[in-house]
Amino acid sequence: MYQKFIITDEGELRFGNVYHHRNLLRWDESCSYGGGLWRVDEEREAVILYGRSFEFGTPEFGSLRYVNWDGIDGVERPLFYQPHWPYDETLVPVACL
């Protein structure tokens, strides 16, 4: 299993440990806003989002409305995106609208 995330059509950022990004969706949902991979950075006490979903594409954080923390133990942490992963470690803060 892999640490993956998606942004649903309702703008929910959802985390999980799954084989495929589609496994994060319920039967009546779809994902138009992409996804990727995630990891917890213990040093920064933050969640790092990186990569893209082969099923749903690159994440569109402009469509993010809220974060569902259930898939990461329910603990809210700062979010950062690595847009150029794996080529550099630039971190861009991610926030909800």
Spell out what each predicted region is.
Residues 1-97:
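Intrinsic low-complexity, intrinsically disordered or marginally ordered coil/linker segments
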